[in-house]
């Protein structure tokens, strides 16, 4: 899944420090709002809507295109998924499982590092909550499947993971601080940083030691590492391989049931496009890595980005056209929205994910 950096090399100069210096030129001069925006403002001019969603410098098109779709289909429900947390910050509600806590400092971190450029902070709050959710699911699975973690220790770990609380915040922060640009993790570095973060959020030292020690158990660290590799961008990895970041998981997290298919299945994709037009369905489509016709990229350069996720906004069966939106909020300008003949959609797109 493409970030703006990968698609247009030379536009951005990156520095992996506490702050990120960005130089923008040309048609894609998209202002980063980290410094100017009030971090206490959840919603901007467009509220919870696709037009408010704008991807940051990471390759999170799979997340931003999906959130834009959910915002189109169920804006009130998505707005209701962000709740105030009594201890500060927010709680993010999902279709299943515990709520995730997102603190103001984690929202600020995301803005400083340009994880997101959306209006307000609601998309970034959902993004941090989603990152914690995918971690939680992988950790629960790893603990349940482990034959080496002592039976008397498992209940402690599962009890922490079965409730909304700061444990996943600590994991999220620790991973963000040590993840490499390709999504890889160093076990020793993660264990050390996780211990620090667990202590900082107030988990007793003995329990913090046990929880960090799980990373030494066979299969446990592997589960964490795989989750980060598959969802590396939401943890701050600038250049992952695009493996596993599928929109169906994001749609599923916020809307319940979701499925995926291939655009080459003409009958299947037409059925979903008709459902989309009828209303109530979220649909995200991903472009191919390449197309056999060399002229295609030239003829469609105003919007074409390979292996990139787009929100599908509408389908006009009479005109045989599909309307989509680039989560960059541009290309094409001014808002990333464009309409394609159905034949061009078939030629340029590989797969889709939809709510059920």
PLM ranges: what are they?
Residues 12, 26-29, 70:
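Alpha-helical transmembrane segments and their juxtamembrane interfaces
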Residues 4-22:
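Bacterial N-terminal signal peptides that target proteins for export
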Residues 32-36:
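Sec/Tat signal peptide C-region and signal peptidase I cleavage site
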Residues 19-31:
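Bacterial N-terminal signal peptides
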Residues 37-356:
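Accessory/interaction modules and long regulatory regions
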